[in-house]
């Protein structure tokens, strides 16, 4: 029997849906999901998605860079690192009023979550009053709030929680095995420690990674395994497709096979069935057909607007047109809660 004939005999119902509650996702288990026939993988991911979410609703988030450039970290993918010559000019923290103006515009454009990102290793104490004021102001507009500011101390996480921050983003970026090839100034454990502080403060965790940085499929599976085995797994999982920026160490990295990106979305959905899975940076590299496949694979959120920190993003009008063609509607944050 040929390999194709063997694959054809596999029934989708025989494919494991998810690990039992008591079982951790081993890397080998996640690799096995990646290696399923493409149609079977998407079929199973869509089944899992429909068990927990409205399959035709996508939550829209807008991301604003509130402090751009000059970061002390040496992340090999990032244009904002002071270690790389990308021509990006470092800027100071934005004024609160300017941030709130941007939030109003995002809400008028259909976003239900407003994310604020600062290029820091960690925020300083002098920044905290402005940051907490931003959180309170954005919440008063009726938007969900999210911040990504680097590593946090316990007290800082508590301050943000007291201000009403809904989500804190701190990505693992990649697998532990590949991590050292991308970053040297922050350890993997540093990232895990910040996630613990955020969770202990009562803030929802937003945590994902970047694929297409030259890692192997097994290393992609290692990232998903790490995320799925967090206790609990993240409420929100952004999946970024590398944007190879000139002047960064990864500028010459070969593009990832787009079907591998779709596979990653599907595997994230299966292993983290109640998480919101978000299409993030690099979405402009996907044509409409591939984005539709991502929604079929279980993506149910995306960053919306013309710029994602310092990388471009598909125009809002184009996104609306795609939603109309697919019969997808935007959903507010409350409606995106997973079904029991």
Curated annotation (Swiss-Prot):
Signal peptide: none annotated. Keywords: 2Fe-2S, 4Fe-4S, Biotin biosynthesis, Iron, Iron-sulfur, Metal-binding, S-adenosyl-L-methionine, Transferase. The gene is bioB. Homodimer. [4Fe-4S] cluster binds at residues 71, 75, 78. This is Biotin synthase. It catalyses: (4R,5S)-dethiobiotin + (sulfur carrier)-SH + 2 reduced [2Fe-2S]-[ferredoxin] + 2 S-adenosyl-L-methionine = (sulfur carrier)-H + biotin + 2 5'-deoxyadenosine + 2 L-methionine + 2 oxidized [2Fe-2S]-[ferredoxin]. The keyword Phosphoprotein does not apply. GO terms for molecular function: 2 iron, 2 sulfur cluster binding; 4 iron, 4 sulfur cluster binding; biotin synthase activity; iron ion binding. Pfam families: BATS, Radical_SAM. It comes from Burkholderia lata (strain ATCC 17760 / DSM 23089 / LMG 22485 / NCIMB 9086 / R18194 / 383). The keyword Ubl conjugation does not apply. InterPro entries: Aldolase_TIM (IPR013785), BATS_dom (IPR010722), Biotin_synth/BioAB (IPR002684), Biotin_synthase (IPR024177), Elp3/MiaA/NifB-like_rSAM (IPR006638), rSAM (IPR007197).
């Amino acid at each position: 029997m040929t390999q194709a004939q063997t694959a054809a005999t596999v029934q989708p119902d025989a494919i494991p849906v998810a690990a039992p509650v008591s079982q951790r996702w081993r890397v080998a288990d996640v690799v096995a999901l990646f290696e399923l026939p493409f149609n079977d993988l998407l079929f199973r991911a869509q089944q899992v998605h429909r068990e927990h979410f409205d399959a035709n609703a996508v939550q829209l988030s807008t991301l604003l860079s509130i402090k751009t450039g000059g970061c002390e970290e040496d992340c090999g993918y990032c244009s904002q690192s002071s270690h790389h010559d990308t021509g990006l000019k470092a800027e100071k923290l934005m004024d609160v009023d300017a941030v709130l103006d941007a939030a109003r515009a995002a809400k008028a454009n259909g976003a239900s979550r407003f994310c604020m990102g600062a290029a820091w290793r960690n925020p300083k104490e002098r920044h905290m009053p402005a940051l907490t004021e931003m959180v309170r102001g954005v919440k008063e507009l009726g938007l969900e709030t999210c911040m990504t500011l680097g590593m946090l101390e316990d007290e800082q996480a508590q301050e943000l929680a007291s201000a009403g921050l809904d989500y804190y983003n701190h990505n693992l970026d990649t697998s532990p095995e590949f991590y050292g090839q991308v970053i040297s100034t922050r350890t993997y454990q540093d990232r895990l420690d910040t996630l613990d502080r955020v969770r202990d403060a009562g803030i929802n965790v937003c945590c994902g990674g970047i694929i297409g940085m030259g890692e192997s499929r097994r290393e992609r599976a290692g990232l998903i395994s790490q995320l799925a085995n967090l206790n609990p797994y993240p409420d929100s999982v952004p999946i970024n497709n590398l944007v190879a920026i000139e002047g960064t160490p990864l500028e010459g990295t070969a593009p990832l096979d787009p079907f591998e990106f779709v596979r990653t979305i599907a595997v994230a959905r299966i292993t983290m069935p109640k998480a919101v899975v978000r299409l993030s940076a690099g979405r402009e590299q996907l044509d409409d057909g591939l984005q539709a496949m991502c929604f079929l694979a279980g993506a149910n959120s995306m960053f919306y607007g013309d710029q994602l920190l310092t990388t471009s993003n598909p125009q809002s009008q184009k996104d609306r047109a795609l939603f109309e063609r697919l019969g997808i509607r935007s959903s507010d944050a409350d409606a995106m809660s997973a079904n029991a």
